[in-house]
C-alpha cells in the first residue's frame, strides 16, 4: 500500500490494491463503480508505516490550505476543498457508513421528488382556490343585483298598495253615499205609503172605465144585488158560448209603462165546476170575471195586486153560483181591504210597484209554508218507514217459524220412512223364519227347555217396558208394540221347533263339531233373561239404519265355514230379538274353524254392536 501511494501527489485521491482484495466480499453501493470498492478487514503487516504516511498527508494538506487561505482566492479554496474531499478514500469508511450514505442519497432523491409533487399540488390547490374565490365574487355580485331588483319590486308593490288603498277608500265613499241615498229614498217611499194607506173618500170612489165596466157604487151603503138574476144568467151563457176565447185584462195608461198586459186563456167544463187555468198564476180568471160581471165589487186580492191568495174568492163564480144569494156572499167574502196586509184595494191598484217588497215577503211566507208541509211529509214518511220495518221484522219471525216447522216435518217424514222400511224387513224375516236348532248336548231342544227361557225373556222385556216412562214421541211407542208382537212370533217359532223333533234326530252326529265351534265362537255370552232397558231401546233406534252395513262387514270379514254348522239356541233367541230380515244361513256363516285372533276380536266387537 505504501508502494502504491508513492508516485501520486499528496493531495490527490487514489485507490490502493492489496493481494487480499480478491479474497474479500464485494459490497454493492448504488451510484458508485465497483472498481476499487473493496476493503480488507485483515490487519496490515506494518501499521506504523501506514500511520506515518497518513500523518504526512494530513500535514501536507494543512500546509496547502493555509497557503490558499493566505492568498484569499475563494475559487482556489473551493477547488482545493474538492481536491481534499477527493483525496479522502471510500475505502476508509466501513460498511455501515456506506449504507448510511446510500440511504441519505435515497432520501435526498425521495425528498426532491416529494418536493416536486408538493409544489405541483400546491399549484393546483392555489388555482382551485382562486377559481372558488372568483365564483364567490360572482355569486356576491349576483346577490347584490337580485337584492336591488327585490328592492325595486318592493317599492313598486308599496306604490301599488297605496293606489289600491286610495281606490278602496273612494269606492267605500261611493258606497256610503249610495246607501245614504237609498235610505233617504226608502224613507220617502215609506212616508208616501203611509200617506196613501190613510182612508180617503176620493180614492174609494174609483172610476171603472179602464176595466170596461160601469162606475162602481159604494159597497158599504148599498147591499142590494148589482144585477138581477137574469143578467147574471145571461152573462154565464155568454161565458158558455165563448169558453175558449181569450180574456184580456185592460190596464190604465199610467200602468202600461210599468207593467205589460197579460193575456190568459181558460177553459170551462161546466158552470158548476171549477176553472182549469192554463196560466202560471192560479185563480186569476175568476177575479177578472167577477170584475166584469159585478162592477160594484172591489177588486180581489189575488195575484193581480196584493199577492195573497184567498181561497174563498178563487172559485167563487163557479162553485158558489146561486142567483138568489149572490150579493150576501159578495158582501161576506170581499171586504174593502186585504185581510192579510190591511191595505185598501184602491191604493194597491194605483201603486203596484210600491208593494213589490211585500210580495217578496208573501213569497217567503209561502216558501215557509211549503217547507213546513215538506217537514210534515218527511215525518209521515219516517213513521211509515218505522211501521214497514216492524212489519218486516214480523214477517221475518214468521218465516223463521215456518222454516222450523218445515225442518221438523222433514225429520218426521224421514223417521216414518225408516219405520216403514223396518216393517217391510220384519215381514221378510217372518217369511224366512229359521229352521229348528240342536242343543249343545246333542238332544233336540224341546218346549220344556225353550219355554222357560223365552218366558223369562218376555217377562224381562215386559218389566223393562213398564219401567220406561211415557215419552211424547210416538215412534218409541210403535217400537214397543213391534217388540211385543215379535215375542208372540218367537213363541210360535218355539212350538214349531218342538213339532219338528223327529226330523232333526239324524243330525246328532254333528253335535261334536258344533261344540268345538261354539267353544271358539266370538258370539256374546249374554243370556236371554237380561231385561231390556230404555237406553237399549234408544240405541236400537239409533243403530237401525246402520244394521245392514254392519252385517255386510261381518260377512265380508268372517271366513267361509261349514254350511251345516248350527248355532247355540240362546244365540238364536238373541238374533230373533234383533228383528233381522236376513236368512239363517247368511247369519251363521260367521262361525269358522280357521280364524286369526284379530279377526275374532273384530267379529266380537261387531256382533256386540249388532246385538245391542
From Swiss-Prot:
<feature type="compositionally biased region" description="Polar residues">
    <location>
        <begin position="575"/>
        <end position="585"/>
    </location>
</feature>
<dbReference type="Pfam" id="PF15369">
    <property type="entry name" value="KIAA1328"/>
</dbReference>
<feature type="modified residue" description="Phosphoserine">
    <location>
        <position position="178"/>
    </location>
</feature>
<feature type="region of interest" description="Disordered">
    <location>
        <begin position="509"/>
        <end position="598"/>
    </location>
</feature>
<feature type="modified residue" description="Phosphoserine">
    <location>
        <position position="558"/>
    </location>
</feature>
<feature type="compositionally biased region" description="Polar residues">
    <location>
        <begin position="555"/>
        <end position="568"/>
    </location>
</feature>
<comment type="subunit">
    <text>Interacts (via N- and C-terminal domains) with SMC3 (via central hinge region).</text>
</comment>
<protein>
    <recommendedName>
        <fullName>Protein hinderin</fullName>
    </recommendedName>
</protein>
<dbReference type="InterPro" id="IPR032736">
    <property type="entry name" value="Hinderin"/>
</dbReference>
<feature type="compositionally biased region" description="Polar residues">
    <location>
        <begin position="462"/>
        <end position="477"/>
    </location>
</feature>
<feature type="coiled-coil region">
    <location>
        <begin position="362"/>
        <end position="406"/>
    </location>
</feature>
<feature type="modified residue" description="Phosphoserine">
    <location>
        <position position="20"/>
    </location>
</feature>
<comment type="function">
    <text>Competes with SMC1 for binding to SMC3. May affect the availability of SMC3 to engage in the formation of multimeric protein complexes.</text>
</comment>
<keyword id="KW-0175">Coiled coil</keyword>
<feature type="modified residue" description="Phosphoserine">
    <location>
        <position position="527"/>
    </location>
</feature>
<feature type="coiled-coil region">
    <location>
        <begin position="90"/>
        <end position="166"/>
    </location>
</feature>
<feature type="modified residue" description="Phosphoserine">
    <location>
        <position position="471"/>
    </location>
</feature>
<feature type="region of interest" description="Disordered">
    <location>
        <begin position="462"/>
        <end position="484"/>
    </location>
</feature>
<keyword id="KW-0597">Phosphoprotein</keyword>
